[in-house]
Amino acid sequence: KSNNMKAFTAFAPASIGNVSLGFDVLGAALAPVDGTKLGDEVEIKAAESFSLETVGRFAHKLPGDADSNIVTKCYHYFCEQMEKAGKTTSPVALTLHKNLPIGSGLGSSASSIVAAFAALNAYFDTPFDEDTLLIMMGELEGQISGSIHYDNVAPCYLGGMTLMTGSDAPVTLSLPLNDEWYYAVCYSGISVSTAAARDILPKQVEMATALTFG
């Protein structure tokens, strides 16, 4: 949404990746049954110089240095891609409403990334199409987790359940959902980063094990 002062707010929902046997390729966006918002928001408005403010329930869990925040990195990456495309940018003030717990398995980083890029793309008059923006989101997600994957950013950005294609166009396909499907999501309060979780996984899995457990 926006107002006459050219300020935008973008919301990005929580998501779950690695759905069932779809490791790194199948993800789903989450929406509470009571209609409340579950996700991060990013506000953007014009400024004389770039700034990032963090607010919200889990803002205190973020790096104290704004330059280390993924939203700041999204801004700089967006500006780099704009320059490559021969387009201009200007300084903005960003506010991240950090409403998702970090390292929770709810796509916390993806939510911040998607909200940031969606806000930036809207503010600068939509210079990038859906697939291009999604690839950019995957690049930034990869900076956090150690490898590019879309199973959180894709459903977070597009909604519903998404299947990654392995190509750049389209990056993902939307899968049909049954309106009567509901997910029970439990958060233990334990924080485990995506990078740490991936390091725990074995580098190889025997064929018999893979066939047995999918």
Regions found by a protein language model. Give the residues of each.
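DPxDG-like acidic metal-binding loop motif
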Residues: 106-130, 157-159
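Predominant activation on well-ordered alpha-helical scaffold segments within soluble catalytic domains
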Residues: 39, 72-76, 114-121, 134, ...
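Short glycine/threonine-rich catalytic loop with a Thr-x-Gly-x-Asp
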Residues: 104-111, 207-212
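Short, glycine/charged-enriched secondary-structure capping and boundary segments
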Residues: 24-27, 110, 200-201
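ATP-dependent small-molecule kinase catalytic core of the GHMP/sugar-kinase superfamily
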Residues: 129-214
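ATP-binding N-lobe of GHMP and related small-molecule kinases
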Residues: 3-104, 122, 126-128
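Short, conserved micro-motifs enriched in small and acidic residues
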Residues: 65-69, 106-114, 148
